[in-house]
Regions:
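Short catalytic-loop micro-motif centered on adjacent basic/acidic residues
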Residues: 50-56
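Conserved alpha/beta catalytic core and glycan-binding cleft of carbohydrate-active enzymes
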Residues: 68-144
Length: 144
């Protein structure tokens, strides 16, 4: 089915919340199945014991929970985490996305904390803004 695996905007254009090209439509059943079966293959065949999802926020919560559940059926110690944000807007509603704001809805799926990273080392996009480890005052509470 043309366009099935990629998320599109209401006008039919492809969405690019990754800023790297088309984003996958993880909320569609066959795309979800493809993602789950792919990680299961890697876990079984290559004994991968952890999976990191770059820009996890482009994926929906249900898919990320399905990934973690399937992996934990193989081995409960397999670690799943990702970046809980996107690099652009997406037609998938925020309430359905695997964002940091929705981490409580992710069953055993962790989200990387850019807040702690930036508090410790300084803002990732502002090299002149030091973090706690470089002596910037007032950050002690943000890195606890």
């Amino acid at each position: 089915v043309p366009g099935y695996y990629y998320r599109q905007r209401p006008d039919g254009s492809f969405s690019d919340a990754s800023a790297c090209g088309n984003e996958t439509a993880s909320e569609r059943p066959m795309m979800r199945k493809y993602i789950v079966e792919s990680v299961l293959y890697w876990a079984r065949e290559y004994h991968i014991d952890g999976f990191r999802f770059d820009l996890m926020g482009i994926h929906d919560i249900e898919t990320m929970n399905a990934v973690t559940k399937a992996l934990h059926e193989i081995d409960p110690s397999i670690f799943v985490y990702g970046e809980g944000w996107t690099a652009g807007s997406s037609p998938l509603p925020d309430a359905q996305r695997a964002l940091k704001a929705n981490v409580a809805q992710l069953d055993a799926t962790a989200a990387f904390s850019d807040d702690i990273r930036d508090g410790l080392r300084g803002h990732v996009f502002t090299p002149t803004d030091p973090g706690f480890v470089s002596g910037k005052p007032g950050l002690a509470e943000s890195v606890k």
